[in-house]
């Protein structure tokens, strides 16, 4: 008999330790940390020497939050393969034990998930924080950087869903956790990158068109 609540039930997790914190406690800490980052970035954006638009400020928040999630949350998971054994109540271990109720591939160390998260931790996370700097300073490469990052996030999320569906989509303990974690939280990494891709595409296209018009007038 399985000693864990995850699906599939025949998943073997030796010495599994259930969550020591309540679900509300885990979400409260997560929410508080996210709010502090959002508030801090909003304040810093307001003090920028440039007159940043609200959209730019929200983009700074997105890249800061997602970058820190990649580096800290996903970094912990990547380098802590036996987090499910944790008996100390470690916050990050508790977060992942809870999330695995919606996608047990994080407990079983599914190769597709390890690959996706490895790229996110090592490349996308640091580059996302660099995007915050690029927006704040109005760097010319800001839109190209954001487009590249959003494409990687969108591609990684697409693989995340497709690999689950191709293998039977049977990694959630129940429908509630399936929709709350796998669909809703996972879908966030499709929705926001898609919107950023569209915006950056329009900005870059407009800039190229402007340059073409200048060249046409010059010649």
Curated annotation (Swiss-Prot):
Disulfide bonds: none annotated. Pfam families: EBP. Its EC number is 5.3.3.-. It is a multi-pass membrane protein. It catalyses: 7,8-epoxymelianol = protoglabretal. GO terms for biological process: sterol biosynthetic process. Pathway: Secondary metabolite biosynthesis; terpenoid biosynthesis. GO terms for cellular component: endoplasmic reticulum; membrane. Residues 55-197 form the EXPERA domain. Keywords: Isomerase, Lipid biosynthesis, Lipid metabolism, Membrane, Steroid biosynthesis, Steroid metabolism, Sterol biosynthesis, Sterol metabolism, Transmembrane, Transmembrane helix. It comes from the Eukaryota. GO terms for molecular function: C-8 sterol isomerase activity; cholestenol delta-isomerase activity; steroid Delta-isomerase activity. The keyword Metal-binding does not apply. The chain crosses the membrane at residues 26-46, 59-79, 112-132, 144-164, 178-198. It is found in: Membrane. InterPro entries: EBP (IPR007905), EXPERA (IPR033118). Isomerase involved in the biosynthesis of glabretanes triterpene natural products such as glabretal, a component with in vitro antiproliferative properties on lymphocytes. Catalyzes the conversion of 7,8-epoxymelianol to protoglabretal via skeletal rearrangements. PANTHER family: 3-BETA-HYDROXYSTEROID-DELTA(8),DELTA(7)-ISOMERASE (PTHR14207:SF0), STEROL ISOMERASE (PTHR14207). Belongs to the EBP family. This is Protoglabretal synthase ISM2. It comes from Ailanthus altissima (Tree-of-heaven).
